[in-house]
Amino acid sequence: MLVIGSGAKHLEGEIKEKAPITNVEIKKFPDGEKYVRILEKGDKAIVVQSTYKPQDEFLIEALLLGDALRENGYRKLKIVIPYMAYSRQDRVTKEGEPISIRAVLKMLGLYYDELYVMDIHNPKTLEFFPGRAENILPSKEIAEYFSDKLGEGIILAPDKGALERAKAIAEILGLEYSHFEKKRISPTEVQMTPVNIDVKGKNVLIVDDIISTGGTMIKATEILRKLGAEKVFVAATHGVFAEGAIERLSKAVDELAVTNTIPTPVSKISIVPEILNLL
């Protein structure tokens, strides 16, 4: 049984075409508190709930859905979180701070046996979840979307930390891959250079987990153009776009596409097949 939370309503139509969805009542009390009610009995359920804006509200709703399902006799619960809130707060940078993602994952572990997230910022943080936790990369979906557009192109990561993401897509498509090396040349300027790869005359796909301002991608694109790249495409799992970022990035590249973990005007790649694989 699939339960769709308010944070994943934008995925409901596509999911409903392929799988039955459990009837759930979700509303707000006049004071703003959430009310949830499970309208069907069962033994196992998968909750799909993204936690992007309003993060706290959708997290509380995920907990209430878990509690309601347990109260209604469900014994085995999984939760799929397309976008995991607080995932970038994964370390203490100033004394007195929490490790926010740890707090969130421990709370979810009170109700859910298994957790599946799409491309979490730091996969190592999933160790904070007490049950089974899995990080899912939408490599197949991104590869399929760009396959014909890229031709015999190259996959690049914007930095070494994102190299595994580029590698996964490149291996599906049978293409070369590499990453940009960043070198600070002054207090205000960072130099970016593709490592050990020739982009001249090639189509290039730059891929990352999250795009916010798009500044890194724009700079990388400018460098690739100077090096003679043919077309430059940019993709990411999560489009956490700052104001004006889509417009600026779309002007700089040949195509910008992100998945629909967060609904945006450029959410052209669906992660629903990955959700359905868990049924």
Curated annotation (Swiss-Prot):
Keyword Nucleus part of the UniProt annotation: no
Signal peptide segment: none
Pfam families in UniProt: Pribosyltran (PF00156), Pribosyltran_N (PF13793)
Q: Where in the cell is it found?
A: Cytoplasm
Q: In which pathway does it act?
A: Metabolic intermediate biosynthesis; 5-phospho-alpha-D-ribose 1-diphosphate biosynthesis; 5-phospho-alpha-D-ribose 1-diphosphate from D-ribose 5-phosphate (route I): step 1/1
Question: A GO term (biological process) for this protein?
Answer: 5-phosphoribose 1-diphosphate biosynthetic process
Residues given in the record as Mg(2+) 2 binding sites: D159
* SUPFAM superfamilies attached to this UniProt entry: PRTase-like (SSF53271)
Family annotation (InterPro entries) = Pribosyltran_N, PRibTrfase_dom, PRTase-like, Rib-P_diPkinase, Rib-P_diPkinase_arc
Residues annotated as binding ATP are D31, G32, E33, R88, Q89
- GO cellular component: a single term: ribose phosphate diphosphokinase complex
One GO molecular function term? magnesium ion binding
Keyword flag Transmembrane: no
User: Where is D-ribose 5-phosphate bound in this sequence?
Assistant: R184, D208, S212, T213, G214, G215, T216
Q: Which Gene3D superfamilies is this protein grouped with?
A: 3.40.50.2020
Binding locations of Mg(2+) 1: H121
The primary site where this protein sits is cytoplasm
- Its Enzyme Commission number(s) read 2.7.6.1
| Annotated keywords | ATP-binding, Cytoplasm, Kinase, Magnesium, Metal-binding, Nucleotide biosynthesis, Nucleotide-binding, Transferase
Name the job this protein performs.
Involved in the biosynthesis of the central metabolite phospho-alpha-D-ribosyl-1-pyrophosphate (PRPP) via the transfer of pyrophosphoryl group from ATP to 1-hydroxyl of ribose-5-phosphate (Rib-5-P).
The record's listing under HAMAP family reads: RibP_PPkinase_A
Q: Which family does it belong to?
A: Belongs to the ribose-phosphate pyrophosphokinase family. Class III (archaeal) subfamily.
Report the protein name in the record. Ribose-phosphate pyrophosphokinase
